[in-house]
């Protein structure tokens, strides 16, 4: 599992994530937006509040995605 250095919200439900190994990925999280509480992330204001929690990214409503998940999408 790689530690996340930075995360930046992009348009169309994407995140720009930089990992500790300096790899950068654009992660499309739209595939999660029809699953349970992740539906809340359809709100652009909420999705833009993403923050780095080290080995995951998290939103104020306590939803999170691990760095492993972000590397797979």
Language-model segments: which ranges?
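Motif-centric detector for short Cys/His coordination patterns
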Residues: 1-73
